[in-house]
Amino acid sequence: MKNNIKVILIGDEQVGKSTIINSFISESFSEITQKTLPEVTIPAEFNNEICSTRIIDTFDDGKNLKNQMNMEIRTADAIVIVYSVDRFDTFMSIRMKWIPLINQLRGSNKSPIIIVGNKLDLVDDKHENNKVQIEETIQYFRSTYSNTIQWLECSAKTMENLPELLYASQTSVFFPERILYNREENKMTEGCERALKRIFKLCDHDNDGSLSEEEINYFQTKCGHETMTSEEIQNIQQFVLSKIPDGVNSNGFTEKGFLYMNLLFLLRGPCQHTWTSLRSFNYDDDLVLLESYVHPTLQVPPNHNTILSSMGNEFFKSLFEKYDSDSDGVLSSFDLVSLFSTTPKIPWEIGFEKHFNTDKDSNLTLSGFLSLWNLQTYENYKVTLEYLAYFGSQTENNNIDMISILNSRELDIKSNQFTRNIVNCYVFGAEAVGKTTFLNTFIGKSFSTLYNATNGNDNFKVCGHLLKNKYLILSEYVGEKIPTAELKSKCDLVCLLYDCNSEQSFKFIENIYNQLKQQQLNIPIVFIRTKNNNNNNNNNNNNNNNNNNNNLNNNNNNINNNNNNNNNNTTTTNANVSTSKIIDSFFKSHKNYSPKDFSISRSNSIYHEMMETIVNSSFNDNSNGSNGSNNSNILTYLVIAAGVAGVGLLLSKYLAKK
């Protein structure tokens, strides 16, 4: 909204333009001898007005003055046309001269017009006779002029309606009718109707398609309107029902009823009530959400990541529950359409659900929904802030407290603590070793025997909820060369997958490993062995961890009975672990590493262990980034403990001698 507006007074000679201005600022009447008054500014503090107001007096006499008046008409925020109620010709001059002049000078840039009949103190029978024609002409103006036209009568001598004149000028600028309402057709504009429908959905907290008494009063309170009693609401409902039968149902006002109530406010005018409602929901003068609301400023320092805060997670959880129409714990396609109806569009491509936890029908679970928004926040928090606004979130800090700023892994290492709630893991491996299955198993997807190679230009990625308030991103990378710059800036952990039956697949990840070391990327590394069912000697697959991860589905559907020897399968019926000299030699010379087994035929604790690797690396900056034990930490602890014990022994002997 503007801090100040410019109002210009025009009209025939001797109608009292200057007298109106003088009486208003001096609060008394006096005869004015000069033809025009200098510009007057009325501060906002005066009478608690909406804003400061500049009032321009005009006089149509001579070429220079006329040019000056025309310039003021072009730039005025509101135009007051004054006529004298005791001279009907000055009123007719509005139709014949002043309205055409305004249309000529303003073109499509219309401004609100206030038609003012001055000298009301001189009203006589003749004026009353002309009043019907005046009212009909005013109605004609309103139907032909595409902006607000208001009409009132006043007296500069008795001060009658002078404050109303200023108020009408200000409200016509700040609450423009044409943006919301077509008076000629008695209907809302499309933009107004669209905005009010969105507000209706935001206030419909239980998403039942109607506004209850509680929800109506939530709307009233948020907009600064007076709350209503049950009796008042029932009276309005009865009135709405008498006009539109489907405007009210057993639960309250329907969307049609809500729109009809606002149409009545617009019909009565001015539009202040509806504008106040719209601005309370952060709409600007063009019925677009405020830029500062949709795109608030969040300063994210270098080497930091973003994720939803606890407040942000709670908001999206409540959003999920609101739009879960049948309370079955998932969002159907119908639910998603309803959810995003308050936004311009769904911000992701079709099929985005496959990257997150869903039910068997690909409907997002709550875990999947929260993972989706945490991943979005991690990759581009600005989109999250934008959609928080579309979903109606509004906090004291303009939604930026919905986002948490986290240290990068490098900063965690420096501070010797693990602070992040999200870990980004890159998964490398040769073709057909089971990378996609490794990702899909994490988010509970069913195993498929069909092999579909991942497109090298579209690396597959999933995100899931691993532990309390912890999220893991798994990004499948296809290619023999590591993306050094990307890994350096984004990667927290590298997973190297190989088929235990294929030396060639191990050579592939050994090459990746060597590149990581050559580039001196200080990133933890985990080796993962696939297609091996003999895990008896591997303590990493302890079934006691079955209950630790709600995202991991037990896909042990008699899969071991499927004697499909297709190499595209990520399991094998061979009970013996296929090893080779190349693989054995590597792990003998790299004792910090011990391969972990992955199998879809059992619940895996491997994803938890990957997170533990990250946590340990934050406390133990090992350049090898191994998934081995913290022997150095233990040794340090033992040395310190022995030292303390020795000091204690010497001290006790000393005291004994004393």
From Swiss-Prot:
Residues exposed to the Mitochondrial intermembrane side: 657-658
Region of interest (Disordered), residue spans: 532-575
EC class: hydrolase
Protein residues bound to GTP 1: 11-18, 57-62, 118-121
Transcription found in the keyword field: no
Residues that span the membrane, as ranges: 634-656
Domain Miro: 2-175, 420-616
Segments forming domain EF-hand: 191-226, 311-346
Function noted in UniProt: Mitochondrial GTPase involved in mitochondrial trafficking. Probably involved in control of anterograde transport of mitochondria and their subcellular distribution.
Name the record gives this protein: Probable mitochondrial Rho GTPase gemA
